[in-house]
């Protein structure tokens, strides 16, 4: 599937993500939530975490779901997509060959377009139908950053990425990729570890 073109720079794209994520407000609930509140503070970055490391990603075959979402429901949308893909893979007896991906193909202040997928060793013999499809994930030269903590706290990470790009005077493609090192379905949200890849021009 061809990637969508953009009319803004990647730095501006990341800035939009940051502004939108920081403007999120919790959804109202009719009953008290018995779970403790999730901290929006990012976990400390460890000295071993890459921040602006140059890497080359190889395209990977992945089963994905595309759609649109608002920032208020971003994490829930991504998790639901992973669940749908996992259910399909379980029925087809397919196993993941790499970490789950969320590819942001277009963003604005209110929401975003996405491709959420799970890499597999090879395309299934019976391709999925309906909401799911098979394609190659983006590859090429990219900068790698690491986020630790809740999804709501990722605006802090993206602000740091924007500052890094500005300081280094680097130009990047108008998209970004999140690779979930920890399972976003099973892991508590405030324990996330996410590789963020910014493709360079």
Listing of model-derived features with the role each one plays in the protein:
Residues 2-9, 14-201:
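A solvent-exposed interaction/effector surface
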């Amino acid at each position: 599937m061809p990637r969508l073109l953009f009319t803004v720079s990647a730095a501006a794209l990341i800035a939009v993500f940051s502004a939108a994520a920081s403007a999120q407000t919790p959804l109202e609930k009719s009953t008290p939530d018995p779970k403790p509140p999730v901290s929006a503070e990012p976990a400390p970055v460890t000295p071993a975490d890459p921040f602006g490391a140059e890497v080359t990603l190889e395209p990977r075959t992945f089963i994905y779901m595309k759609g649109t979402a608002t920032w208020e429901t971003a994490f829930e949308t991504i998790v639901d997509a992973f669940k749908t893909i996992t259910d399909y893979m379980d029925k087809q007896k397919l196993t993941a060959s790499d970490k789950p991906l969320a590819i942001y193909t277009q963003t604005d202040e209110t929401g975003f377009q996405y491709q959420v997928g799970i890499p597999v060793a090879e395309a299934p013999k019976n391709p999925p139908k309906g909401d799911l499809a098979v394609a190659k994930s983006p590859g090429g030269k990219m900068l790698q950053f690491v986020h630790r903590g809740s999804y709501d706290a990722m605006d802090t990470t993206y602000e740091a990425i924007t500052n890094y790009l500005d300081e280094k005077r680097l130009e990047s493609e108008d998209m970004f990729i999140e690779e979930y090192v920890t399972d976003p379905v099973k892991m508590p949200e405030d324990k996330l570890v996410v590789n963020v890849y910014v493709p360079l021009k």
